[in-house]
């Protein structure tokens, strides 16, 4: 089996696990099991803070790792404890104080894994894929994961209606265990391609972030994109808090999220290589700015879902375009460090947004909060466009 097939398969299996153990599904699960909206926000934001710490600690050695493939594969093993804990909660019927403590610990491990992967995610493709077609490859991968995500979200809705919420989640968490193991095996058995960069040296180039122009000139862009992403990451909590979502409509959010991932990936697969990345980023970030406020106009569930669908379609394109732009901005020899620094800014903004989201809504209202979210993405798009145009990047 080729690396490309393994890449597609592992990504598709991982989206199943990630859908059921993070984001909207995890937020709904916690709130359905007695956690308040604010505590749910704190738990999710704490995970982001842990990811930041993991990236901060791992960043100095990211470009010195010789065995990128096996190290990346092992990070997936850190996801098992959270899946097992969520399954136990389903079987017992409640958290209790012991399981609540364990929840924080397992989310911590989950977040450490995410932080480590963030440092390696832009080095792995160089080892296993033909980077000349990286944009198209990731877009096709996004289409596959989007289709899978849409299917499993429909299955989630059907199971909840047929079996009840608790039984449905028990079955799905149980399914996550073999899928997670298969993901690990697929990545672990990948082999470096002939054109893969040579193994890193112990004296690999070390960058000074505050003298490295790509990092410095895009600080605001990456931080504000993270802040906007942080609001969207807790969108179910926002919907619950603003009284426009319940468990049933939250399940629809998951369906929309996966459908728009498919739509955004399909759109990106068509335009990548034909339209310069700087223009893709600018146009889609303008789309984000326009669509995010729609979610909380009039406190309507229908408008919330329409706005969310539009926003996440543009968001998907942005999330695929920035990694491709990053391959133009930074050289492979410093890719791990630059990516760690960039994602550190992004995750810092995301974590801060998670902590402040409910407070912002209380302070300025739901609609102004979503307008602010859109403006964050607009600044990101303009900043990347100006930087890439100035440096003659495509």
Role assignments for model-derived ranges:
Residues 68, 158-177, 359-377:
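A membrane-interface helix-boundary motif in multi-pass transporters
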Residues 70-86, 279-294, 374:
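Structural signature of the two symmetry-related core transmembrane helices
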Residues 37-38, 129-141, 247, 330-342:
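Loop-to-transmembrane helix entry/capping segments in MFS-fold secondary transporters
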Residues 54-67, 160, 264-277, 361-362:
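Helix-to-loop junctions at the C-terminal end of transmembrane segments
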